[in-house]
UniProtKB/Swiss-Prot annotation:
Keyword Membrane applies: yes
Site entry (In-frame UAG termination codon), positions: 760
Low complexity biased stretches: 452-461
Signal peptide segment: 1-31
Region described as Fusion peptide: 511-532
Short sequence motif YXXL motif: positions: 712-715
Intervals, Extracellular compartment: 32-684
Keywords of the record: AIDS, Apoptosis, Clathrin-mediated endocytosis of virus by host, Cleavage on pair of basic residues, Coiled coil, Disulfide bond, Fusion of virus membrane with host endosomal membrane, Fusion of virus membrane with host membrane, Glycoprotein, Host cell membrane, Host endosome, Host membrane, Host-virus interaction, Lipoprotein, Membrane, Palmitate, Signal, Transmembrane, Transmembrane helix, Viral attachment to host cell, Viral envelope protein, Viral immunoevasion, Viral penetration into host cytoplasm, Virion, Virus endocytosis by host, Virus entry into host cell
InterPro entries for the chain: Gp120_core_sf (IPR036377), Gp160 (IPR037527), GP41-like (IPR000328), HIV1_Gp120 (IPR000777)
Ranges where the record places region V5: 455-470, 457-470
Residues linked to a glycan: 87, 129, 135, 140, 143, 159, 163, 189, 198, 234, 241, 262, 276, 295, 301-302, 331, 338, 354, 360, 384, 394, 400, 405, 442, 457, 611, 616, 625, 637, 674
Gene name of the encoded protein: env
This protein's name: Envelope glycoprotein gp160
Coiled coil stretches, renumbered: 633-667
Lineage of origin: Viruses, Riboviria, Pararnavirae, Artverviricota, Revtraviricetes
Amino acid sequence: MRVKGSGRNYQHLWRWGTMLLGILMICSAAEQLWVTVYYGVPVWKEATTTLFCASDAKAYDTEVHNIWATHACVPTDPNPQEVVLGNVTENFNMWKNNMVEQMHEDIISLWDQSLKPCVKLTPLCVTLNCTNLRNDTSTNATNTTSSNRGKMEGGEMTNCSFNITTSIRSKVQKEYALFYKLDVVPIDNTSYTLINCNTSVITQACPKVSFEPIPIHYCARWFAILNCNNKKFNGTGPCTNVSTVQCTHGIRPVVSTHLLLNGSLAEEEVVLRSENFTDNAKTIIVQLKEAVEINCTRPNNNTTRSIHIGPGRAFYATGDIIGDIRQAHCNISRAKWNNTLKQIVIKLRDQFENKTIIFNRSSGGDPEIVMHSFNCGGEFFYCNSTQLFSSTWNGTEGSNNTGGNDTITLPCRIKEIINMWQEVGKAMYAPPIKGQVKCSSNITGLLLTRDGGNSKNGSKNENTEIFRPGGGDMRDNWRSELYKYKVVKIEPLGVAPTKAKRRVVQREKRAVGTIGAMFLGFLGAAGSTMGATSMTLTVQARLLLSGIVQQQNNLLRAIEAQQHLLQLTVWGIKQLQARVLAVERYLRDQQLLGIWGCSGKLICTTTVPWNTSWSNKSLDKIWGNMTWMEWEREIDNYTSLIYTLIEESQNQQEKNEQELLELDKWASLWNWFNITNWLWYIKIFIMIVGGLVGLRIVFTVLSIVNRVRQGYSPLSFQTRLPSQRGPDRPEGIEEEGGERDRDRSGRLVDGFLAIIWVDXRSLCLFSYHRLRDLLLIVTRIVELLGRRGWEALKYWWNLLQYWSQELRNSAVSFVNATAIAVAEGTDRVIELLQRAFRAILHIPTRIRQGLERALQ
């Protein structure tokens, strides 16, 4: 009995422990998180896109056509919006900025496009008979008392004569023109030819074409341009003060070398920027804090003449010079320039360990590299910048080797045949400008190169650094203005875990081969069934949009190839590309939202459970401590997988809804008696009965064949066979003589319909008996389960009452014990306090008693 009781107690404890463990598991189970889609989140990624221009072209001279074609740009925004991005740190790299490459290609394309309709000077590639033009040959001198200072050196200009074929091919006409010495190449003592005739096709700039740099704002649609506002930003690395703009500031496309003109200034101090300061092959871009004014002039009062070189073609040349032939020059304030060099030297010494800084002239090369080249009023100046870069700085004070007065005068030469962008095969002839030419510009930056070499071999002093003016790569000019910008693409779609789940039609998910269908082409599912194709609608929609995009790209390429026929400028192509790309990106996002069942929603819940392998951070940490950019970087590797799961979930949901709608036709009881449904019932019934009869015939034939093989012959169909008794009525034994006569025998029926009737009756009886037995079994099981369940519930209720009573008794006992312990402790404390108090009160008595004993 004791053992049995122990077993029962153990069984009760086991049940109770199992129940408690289940309760603990339910209570401690982690709450399920679900993927939620957000549209419009502030997330971006680095991108390269087509930029277009904005400009105030109408604010400039409308009589001329500027070579930058800014008339095709959109107007600038009178109230540009700039949004400061708080708590954002973004990495910039001015040396890996696609905006620079794009601007460089745009400027080259603009120059090429502006020269396409202009006159080719191929007829001038003939032998020229030239003589040096001297000052004493000038006519109508207006200032005969002027000093020789500033006069052009002898041989700087030449008077050349040449033969030109007239409109009548058999006749040759002799013409003359004045050329600068830099534009002709001597063949012998008196014979010359134009400098680029042997290597390039020279194109004359069209009349009324202006080279004046007009500010161009680069803009992006459906993209964002990030702007770094750090005042000392060196062009690379993280930037903590970031804002977003729709367009850049106005950038003047000034084509110059050595000096950067009319650009932006540094806000606090001079800033040096280089991809690698230790690599002497890398250009150093200097951004000044204060601009230095440079005033340039061509004092010659030139006249121009037109020479016809063919039908509808004219060559514009310098006809004569009124007054003295004076040299072009530029003036710069010596004090301002020295102060600028002083600020640059301070930064260079900080960068190169307080070494002695030496500025020297260019080391040689093409005229564009050796001299400071730029455009002034339509004339291309080539100025000797040796006086600007000829000083040594041992500290904050420098020694200038040139000395002189308060103004630095740079002698300049003029070229009319320009080797465009230092590219082989392209040259331009800039027609001369009438009258005098003057221009004023601001020097806002420098382009420097550092001498290399090994100091141990004596190539240079190890305590000095030599810097020379550089340039030639116009990318550095654009980079000096675009250093603080970068283009990013906006990714408005974001996914994050939440506790919310989409309420959907619950149905078991079918294993349909959608993965294989993902790799089918747009028309690859044409031969599949409609049911299989319905699961690939997502793929088809995506491929359809891709086809539209591809067609648009093909259209753009065709337009770009035929822009000379359509008369589209480079900016027109850029705007078309930018607008189409913006529409494409918007359609792509809307397409994804539609595929996910989130059209028109900013917050869209899904039925995709969140996988902790994507990110195991808690909701509080995600939504309370992380930005969308940080979160996007956290799950960037799983974004495509999450998108795929959302698509599959939505496909299953749509399939479930379709099947639910198909079940709606059974919602009304009257639909059950529809004639169409009854025909369907009859068809199914006939198929079942026919199948059963066929099986009966097959088995009968097989039985006959089997008996024949065993040596029996088939019985007559008129023979009566004894019917089988039930299991509760066994056949009689031999002693029960007359019992067997009572066995009933069934006669084999005649005819096919009779056989069908007997088989159908037997089938119905068999089905009835089996269903009745199954119903009885189910009833017994339900009854048993109900009784056992009721007993279990009563047991759990009694167990709950028992343990609640035990807990109540334990709590009462604990409170009583605590109260008793507190009471006893309180009594002891009070007793101790009383003893201490009495001891203090008896101190005088004890003192008096002690004194009395001492005195006795």
